[in-house]
UniProtKB/Swiss-Prot annotation:
It comes from Pseudoalteromonas atlantica (strain T6c / ATCC BAA-1087). This is Uridylate kinase. It comes from the Bacteria. The keyword Ribonucleoprotein does not apply. Belongs to the UMP kinase family.
Amino acid sequence: MSTTPKHAYRRILLKLSGEALMGEEGFGIDPKVLERMAQEIKELVELGIEVGLVIGGGNLFRGEGLAKAGMNRVVGDHMGMLATVMNGLAMRDALHRAFVNARLMSAIPLNGVCDAYNWAEAISLLKSGRVVIFAAGTGNPFFTTDSAACLRGIEIEADAVLKGTKVDGVYDSDPAKNPDAVLYKKLSYSEVLDKELKVMDLAAFTLARDHNIPIRVFNMNTPGCLRAVVLGEDVGTVICHPEKQDN
């Protein structure tokens, strides 16, 4: 008799911010945080969940300041894409050290470093139980890694985009500034837009809405929270169409 717990998702797209990899550091990658995240992803693989992963690059490069100083936006975005590849390489290595088979695919070709993104191959790898890390965003400037996460989530037919953040979900105001901020448990796409809640940028959010892919926002810094999300526990905030909120 199987003792494997039932889970809410078959295939997910996990979005992690680059800042999450910094831990207590002010820059770069905290090895302890990287190892913990790899172990949490390993738990999902052992549950039989297919995992696609997008990591931001903000821990290594932020283009806003340089853009204000006159740097061309396209150049800055290309540098940001390369930062996500660096994070992807670090995560792939951490997963391999945790005995998890992982592949890194980049939206911009980097022969000898990682694989070029290929939709059909990504699907095949996911079905075979490999973690697939999608790097370099969409491969185009002016699009965020949140947009890349939603795009890849739609392409691989993920059941949801799970966005790991530094807070417990979506609040009615900034919990760092307002101790009385209220955490939402469920929201519709239209409620997020009407209330002007900051979940992700508008291009990414409307992409998810138009393709009816749920978004789950949770605290990646809480150990075990990712596992709780995929097991269907009531943690974080789920955003979807109203008819799906009772499912």
